[in-house]
Amino acid sequence: MTDNKNLGGSTLLPAYFGEFGGQFVAESLLPALDQLEKAFVDATNHPEFRQELAAYLRDYLGRPTPLTECSNLPLPGQGRGYARIFLKREDLVHGGAHKTNQVIGQALLAKRMGKTRIIAETGAGQHGTATALACSLLGLECVVYMGAKDVARQQPNVYRMQLHGAKVIPVESGSGTLKDAVNEALRDWTATFHESHYLLGTAAGPHPFPTIVREFHKVISEEAKAQMLERTGKMPDVVVACVGGGSNAIGMFADFIDEEGVELVGAEPAGEGLDSGKHGATITNGQIGILHGTRSFLMRSSDGQVEESYSISAGLDYPGVGPQHAHLHSTGRATYVGITDAEALIAFQYLARYEGIIAALESSHALAYALKRAKLAEEEGKQITILVSLSGRGDKDVDHIRRTLEEKPELILKEEER
């Protein structure tokens, strides 16, 4: 694999975020990437495409999504006005998560390009579900690659994809998780790109995917900024989102990046602990390298081999991260922190018990960080407003969480915490 930049090629849009990004792919895929970039630039400059996309976001996805303030959480110092936590409710998007935002955009783009077949990868099944429903809506063939382990732990989403007419292909190779599903999807696309579009589900991969995914997800932060100004009269102090590959986070960060007074925080999966060897905290504990066509942080061994990631949340179980997140980290514009499985499970239970919201395990990582910051605000005697990307709903996780809590009863909320 070589980088298009080093082949003397050129791109219409910047292919790098600082030192991160690029097109580290087989030369046979470069024409497909060039075609995709040109189609994206043409489409987003075309009023009819923008109007069609806006109509689907409004009438099919249900945008704008609401902003909900947590009013019942037993926050430290809440009665003294230290912390206010607001949730951007991407769990209410049709399909159950933020994923559908950019899936509709890419599917419309693929149809505009004359593609008849959509290839996708999925971890938790949310991206696969979003892709399947978009293909059903737009009359496109849909093939979804999913790690065999993820198929086993996300059966409801597998069935949902099949109900929408998608062919779900379990991937047994490697660790049988998201990384391996991406590998198989890329192999498929390499062989079939003349009729197929690879609908990448995260803000990673070779250029122009990180830019395309960000631009189609930017609606999250555009809405949230306007809603926060309307509700509070000011910007949030902290914006937090979970980070696996980084799609919901880059959508949530995008419109706040130039707001210097807003702190951006990505909550990575620390799994069983950053020193346990079982985590997916790519930026917090990773190294710079190349994975799935892009230069970014990844989990790899001293001899350069990609290591297996781990998270209780299938959607965060990925050993890489989008290149713009790597750049935001390296420049200090955003901070990335590890949240353990246990912390996410506690946050999940708090939100369900006190606010009546079943959040995805992915989103629960972001909420767990918000709860930590609320406690810190009380200790410091400072007021703080925290905006959380509630990236998806947790229906898919309920059985998994029930089994986990049965195995680890010490993580069940105590009566006094209820």
Swiss-Prot record:
**Positions in coiled-coil regions:** none
Question: Hey, which pathway is this one from?
Answer: Amino-acid biosynthesis; L-tryptophan biosynthesis; L-tryptophan from chorismate: step 5/5
Recorded hits in InterPro entries, A to Z, give: Trp_synth_b_CS, Trp_synth_beta, Trp_synth_beta/beta-like, TrpB-like_PALP, TrpB-like_PALP_sf
Q: N6-(pyridoxal phosphate)lysine modification sites?
A: K99
Reactions catalysed according to its record? (1S,2R)-1-C-(indol-3-yl)glycerol 3-phosphate + L-serine = D-glyceraldehyde 3-phosphate + L-tryptophan + H2O
* E.C. code: 4.2.1.20
Pfam families, from UniProt?
PALP
User: What is its cofactor?
Assistant: pyridoxal 5'-phosphate
Q: A single GO CC term, please?
A: cytoplasm
Q: Does the keyword Lyase apply?
A: yes
Keywords, comma-separated and alphabetical: Amino-acid biosynthesis, Aromatic amino acid biosynthesis, Lyase, Pyridoxal phosphate, Tryptophan biosynthesis
MF-aspect GO terms:
tryptophan synthase activity
Enumerate the PANTHER family for this protein: TRYPTOPHAN SYNTHASE, TRYPTOPHAN SYNTHASE-RELATED
Q: Which family does this protein fall into?
A: Belongs to the TrpB family.
| SUBUNIT field | Tetramer of two alpha and two beta chains.
Give the protein's biological function. The beta subunit is responsible for the synthesis of L-tryptophan from indole and L-serine.
Q: What is this protein called?
A: Tryptophan synthase beta chain 1
- What lineage does the source organism belong to? Bacteria, Bacillati, Actinomycetota, Actinomycetes, Mycobacteriales
